[in-house]
Every structure is written in structure tokens, then in C-alpha cells.
């Protein structure tokens, strides 16, 4: 943090300065022609700065990496590495992936595959823990169930970010009855 402040205050050189580019400010919806001072993998400041390396961005646009907050890599029918090549090329640098389709077919082996595979991608991938395996109680996946106790060890994994979507109207109905939640109350709130 101290290095960022020193660069921003002009007391230290940035590692890289992107010169003369157009910065897309996604918060204010403005496009500003300015320089971007970078130290390490962080933006230190915008404005007139000097750096150890300068990249001329004349006529180019500089934007933050995009974040896809909910997606299913396996729906693209490619590996995480192959998916990331296309996503990164279009500006997506971070995704939150729910691998429930793969996990519903392969069980924990599918989840383990996904966690191992995302390590080799050039983007940040957070895995959301599939919450409904199998997805319905009228279909069996052959790989068994993943219950809360099965999820516990995965919560220690830094790549597992949270709990994924709850699927299936019948499952919701069963859970509401099991825990005495009024289905009528839920229907009126939906």
C-alpha cells in the first residue's frame, strides 16, 4: 500500500505508465484521456506520471477487467482453460462459476476436476459450491449426493467462494415443508 501511495504522490516511479490512452470510467460513464500509473498489479493513479516502463496507448481505450458474476463453464462444452482463452480476449478477467451441471453428472470428481482445471487459466475463477446434487429427487446422477457434510472440506479451498444457486421447485417445496416454512408465504414474496 505504501508503494501505491508513493507513486500516487509522485515520490516514486510507477512500474508501468500507460500514456495517452482513453480510460473508460465504468462508475461515472465517462471516457477520459489520461495516463495510468501502475505498480505491481495495481493501478496507483491517473494523471501525468513517470514510470520505469512506458507504453504508448495513443488512440486506445483502457478499461477495467470485466467480472461475470454467474456462469457455467461446462455449458460452453469446453475445458476451463479453453473457455478462459475466449473470455479473457473479450475483457473478462474474473468469473464466478457454478459447475452444477458437471457435478450433477460426476459428483465430487467433477468438482475436483473443476478446481484443478481452473488453476491453469489466465483469469481469476471463483467456484460456487453446487447446492443441489442431484438437481432433483426424481433423477439420479449415478455419482451420489453431495450433502452439507460433503461440502465442508471444500469450504477451506480458497477457490470456493460461496454457495451456488438453489435449483428445482420440487426441492424448494420439500425443504419448506421440512422446515415448516409456509409455502404460501414464499409464493406471495416471489
How does the language model describe each region?
Residues 4-7, 84-190:
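Divalent-metal coordination cores built from histidine and acidic residues
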Residues 54-55, 83-85:
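Glycine-rich, phosphate-binding/catalytic loops in enzymes
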Residues 26, 64, 74-76, 97, ...:
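Conserved protein kinase catalytic core
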Residues 21, 41, 59, 70, ...:
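Divalent metal-coordination and catalytic microenvironments
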Residues 1-64:
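Histidine-rich, glycine-flanked metal-binding segment
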Residues 26, 57, 69-71, 75, ...:
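Generic detector of well-ordered alpha-helical packing
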Residues 16, 64-66, 94, 161:
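Hydrophobic "anchor" residues on beta-strands that sit immediately upstream
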Residues 60-82:
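Di-metal (Zn2+ and/or Mg2+/Mn2+) metal-binding site signature of metallo-dependent hydrolases
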